[in-house]
Amino acid sequence: MRKELSKVCGTTGVIVSAHTSLCVDPIQTYGTPEQKAKYLPDLASGRKLGAFGLTEPGAGTDAQGQQTKAVLDGDEWVLNGTKIFITNGKEADVYVVIAVTGKIEKRGRVQKEISAFNVKKSTPGFTFGTKEKKMGIRGSATYELIFTDCRIPKENLLGKKGEGFKIAMHTLDGGRIGIAAQALGIAEGALERTIEYVKERKQFGRAIGQFQNTQFQLADMATKVQAAQMMVYRAAVAKATQKDYGFEAAMAKLYAAEVAMEVTTKAVQLHGGYGYIREYDVERMMRDAKITEIYEGTSEVQRMVISANLLK
């Protein structure tokens, strides 16, 4: 579904992906029966929208660099901190938020204890800051989340105390498949529009699709899109059938994102001057494609995940 949505609109694809992969999935996987009954019916039906709060000004790729804190005070957790670049920010009703809840010793080193929480939009002390002006996916809301003595019930802890990092990594693994599907959809959409264009556009007395240079570029684009599709589907099957699918998810996300960027760039080039104006979709698709190489872990992070799996 996310792929098909993204063939037409990458923004719609990421709104759905953030909702399902980053909010619904962790609640479904780690939530208590009470939490599932409270949140999932409205989230699954679409009556409410979900989001995921992990990234901070000083903690992007380094998820252990979290500064947002949650302190237990009686029967409530008190949250203080800031999250940035949050997809569906302000528009979402339910947020899965990652925060530091203490310190633990692991392998002889003192590390931050990280936990996950469910936070409703209407909670006092939870506000929204800057709305980002983005290069692409402009139709999606990307906001700063601000927690100032934000009190939530003790039972809003998602999973166990200290499981936040595991929950975040699990969530990102699933999210990467969603972004890979988004990237694949953008690439497919750009390829389809380019094929239509080169059949109609005439130069030197014939359609530009009759020139061998154009044909070879289309062949390369189509081959890479097909290869990306196989990787995305393989990762999706792995998620559905096995516990550990991070390796496949990282490869699918890396390859599909880089293919999307390459295919949309070539699509703009093959459209010539028309590819640079808003009348044609490919300029938007190229801008939308770029973010797929960045969010849910940059291409460099995916290479780190892949190599770590190969060498473990």
Describe each region flagged by the PLM:
Residues 46-54, 98:
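A short, Trp-centered hydrophobic/proline-enriched beta-strand micro-motif
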Residues 2-6, 99-100, 119-124, 148-152:
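Short Ser/Thr-interspersed hydrophobic loop/turn segments at strand-loop and sheet-helix junctions
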Residues 1-18, 30-35, 42-46, 60-63, ...:
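Alpha-helical interface subdomain recognition
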Residues 75-76, 80-128:
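A short core secondary-structure module
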Residues 24-30, 52, 64:
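Flexible, glycine-rich active-site loops centered on histidine and acidic residues
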Residues 65, 122-151:
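Flexible, small-/acidic-enriched active-site or ligand-binding loops
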Residues 58-61, 85-88, 107-109, 134-141:
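Short Gly/Pro-enriched turn/cap motifs at secondary-structure boundaries
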Residues 67-69:
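Short, surface-exposed charged micro-motifs
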